[in-house]
Amino acid sequence: MSESEPVHIEYADETELLTEFRNFMSDPDTREKAANYLLNSLIDESILGIVFEVHHAYKTGSVAAIEGQPEDPKSFTIVDMPDMDVFGSTNSKKAIDCSCPNCNRIVAASRFAPHLEKCMGMGRNSSRIASRRIANTRDGGNYFGADEDDEDDADWSGEKRKKKIAPVRTNGSKKNVMKIYFL
């Protein structure tokens, strides 16, 4: 049996393995060989892992993404001046203003979308308002001769029904059952 071949020995139980290990490690020459073998194996595995990672990075082209562009060290200097933050920007809390393309008013950026919606007549109520305007500007009568044919209709824009949730126990059980009542 040569020294380069791996040795495979089967043991009957754990105690036999431990006694054989203790006998093997009691010899200083064997202990030194085992320590050197372990150290060389760890170094080889580490180097091989790094070589494979670098090779894979170059083959896939991800080295350029990892290395990136050289950075300008001046852009990372910390500024210590009054009225400026650490990056050199002024500490202004001025709100950003926008100009409405419809009416040319200056509006705060946080209110620009609601303003534009109302200004252009695109809001959620604008279709109702438009239909009211059309109804008011229409000629005096309609086909049936009545001024308003929807006077007797239910008012769907009125109050909404409120839900009242009441916990109720049924049949003496401990489980709560929720019943919903409409007022």
Swiss-Prot record:
One of its GO terms (cellular component) is DUBm complex. It is found in: Nucleus. Its main location: nucleus. Pfam families: Sgf11 (PF08209). Disulfide bonds: none annotated. Residues 146-156 have a biased composition (Acidic residues). The keyword Acetylation does not apply. One of its GO terms (molecular function) is zinc ion binding. One of its GO terms (biological process) is regulation of transcription by RNA polymerase II. A zinc finger (SGF11-type) spans 98-119. Residues 140-167 are annotated as: Disordered. It comes from the Eukaryota. The keyword Nucleus applies. Keywords: Activator, Chromatin regulator, Metal-binding, Nucleus, Transcription, Transcription regulation, Zinc, Zinc-finger. InterPro entries: SAGA_su_Sgf11 (IPR013246), SGF11 (IPR051078). Gene3D superfamilies: Classic Zinc Finger (3.30.160.60). The long N-terminal helix forms part of the 'assembly lobe' of the SAGA deubiquitination module. The C-terminal SGF11-type zinc-finger domain forms part of the 'catalytic lobe' of the SAGA deubiquitination module. Belongs to the SGF11 family. Component of the transcription regulatory histone acetylation (HAT) complex SAGA, a multiprotein complex that activates transcription by remodeling chromatin and mediating histone acetylation and deubiquitination. Within the SAGA complex, participates in a subcomplex that specifically deubiquitinates histone H2B. The SAGA complex is recruited to specific gene promoters by activators, where it is required for transcription. Component of some SAGA transcription coactivator-HAT complexes. Within the SAGA complex, participates in a subcomplex of SAGA called the DUB module (deubiquitination module). This is SAGA-associated factor 11 homolog. The gene is Sgf11.
